[in-house]
Amino acid sequence: MCGKWFAILATGAILTALLVQSGGAQQQGTGKQPAAPKQSSDWPLYRHDSAGTGYSPLTQITTENVANLKQVWTYRLQPDVSAPAAAAKGKGKGGGANSEATPIVVNGVMYLPGVGRVVALEPETGKEIWTYEVTGAAPSRRGVAYWPGDGINPPRIVFAAGRRLIALNANSGKIDPGFGKEGEVDMVVPYNSVPLVYRNVLVVGANTPAGPSGAPGNARAFDARTGAKLWEFNSVAQPGDVGHDTWEADSWKNRSGANAWPFYFTVDEQRGLVYLPLASPASDFYGGDRKGANLYGNSVVAVDALTGKYRWHFQTIHHDLWDHDPPAPPALFDITRNGRSIPALALTTKSGYMYILNRETGEPIFGVEERPVPKSDVPGEQAYPTQPFPVKPPPIARNSFKPEDLVSAQDTTPEHAQACRELIEKNGGVTNAGPFTTWPYRPDSAPAKTTRSR
C-alpha cells in the first residue's frame, strides 16, 4: 500500500474506509509490548495484539494529516433493511439489528461479521472476496477470530453465533467440515463476543441471564483443529477449588453470573496465561442469599491457556452489590521499577479504580489496601466489611458525589440550582457514605427515597 493508507471505521450498519495521501509509510516496532504481530500493517486481533494494547505502529496517518482523510468506499453491514423488526432480536437480518465489530485484517484481507453473515473484503476497495450467510442465531456483533492453520487444516475464521462456535475456511468462506460436526460446535452456553486464539486453542466466555440461578458463566476452550472441548474453568468456586469457602451455606450451588463476558480476551503468549475478567455473581444488587466474598466474582483469574489450570486470582470487589465488574480484560505491558523489569497488567472496574498487578503472580505492584466501607441496612444483606483500594494510581473516574456536586449556581442560575436542590430533597435527597455506598432499604409503606450517589 505504498503512498496511501486506509482508516477503517465500523459504525452501526455502515463500514467506512478513509484514505490519506502522503509519502511512504515508516513502520516502527512496538517496544516492550508482548506478542506484537509479525505483520505490522495487519490488524489480526480485536485489539491488534494479544496484550490488548489497541496500538498500531503505523505512522502514515498523523495529527498533521488526519484532517485530509477522504471517504473512498462504504460497505453496508445491514443489507436487508426491509426485514421485519422482529428479526432484530439476534436472528436473521432484522432491520433493527446492527454490527458493532472491530474488523480484523490478516495478510491483507479484512474479515468481519455483518448482520446475519460473515464477510471477507479487500481493504483497499471494499470489494467482497466472499460472504457466508449465517442461519439461526446471528453471528457475534463484536467480531471474528483468525486461526492460521497447522499445515494439515487450512486457515480458519472462527466466530460465535448464539451457542454455536462456527469455523469457515478463511480462503473460501465455506464451512470447514473438519471442525466439530460439519463446521460447528455446540458450546451449550452462548457467547456473544470474539474467541481468543492461542496456538491451537480457542477460548470463549459465556453470556448468562441476570437471574441468581441458571447456566454457569464458565470460560471454556476448544481445539482449533477438531473442535473438541479441552477445558472449562469454574467461575464460581466449586468444592476443592481455591476460594470455595467464600460462599456461605452452599450458596455456590446452581449460581449464575460471575461470567466471562468480555468482548475479547488477553493472553501472555510467553507464559501461556490467559486472563479471565469475571463479572458480578447474580443477582447483581442483592446478595442476601450468597453471603461471603463470592469468588471468583469480580476477579481477574489467570489460567493456563492450554489446560485451564488455575494459577492465581485477584478480586476487585468482595460480595459485589453494584454490578461493578471489570468492563474489559486487562491490558498487558512491562514496567521498570527499581531497575527491574516487571511483567504487569492493568485491570479497570466500573468503580473507577485501576489495579496494576504482576501478571505472573497476581501481586499488586503499587499496593492495595483493604479499607472499611459502609454497611447495609437491607434485611438479610451482609455487605462485605472491607474493599480493596489501590494505593496507586488514584481513581480514574469519580466514585462518589456530594449534593453540591450535582448542581450549583455556577452550572446554571442561583434560582435554578435552588429549584433542583429542592426537587432532589423532595425525592429523598442524596445518600452518600463514600465509595461502595450500599443501596438503602425502603419498606413498602415508606415514601420513596433516595437519590443515591456513590
Walk through the language-model features, giving the residues of each.
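N-terminal secretory signal peptides that target proteins for export/translocation
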Residues: M1-K4
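Bacterial N-terminal signal peptides
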Residues: I8-L19
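Extracytoplasmic/lumenal domain signature
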Residues: E64-Q78, V118-A138, P148-G151, R164-V189, ...
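Mature N-terminal segment immediately following signal peptide/propeptide cleavage
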Residues: G31-S82, T102-V106, G362
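Short, polar loop/linker segments at the starts of domains and inter-domain junctions
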Residues: T53-N65, A83-G96, W247-D250
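PEST-like low-complexity, intrinsically disordered acidic/proline/serine-rich tracts
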Residues: S40, S82-E100, V106, Y111, ...
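Repeat-blade elements of multi-bladed beta-propeller folds
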Residues: W43-R47, G95-V115, A138-R164, Y191-S213, ...
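N-terminal pre-domain segments of enzymes
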Residues: A25-Q60, K91, Y384-S400, E404-C420
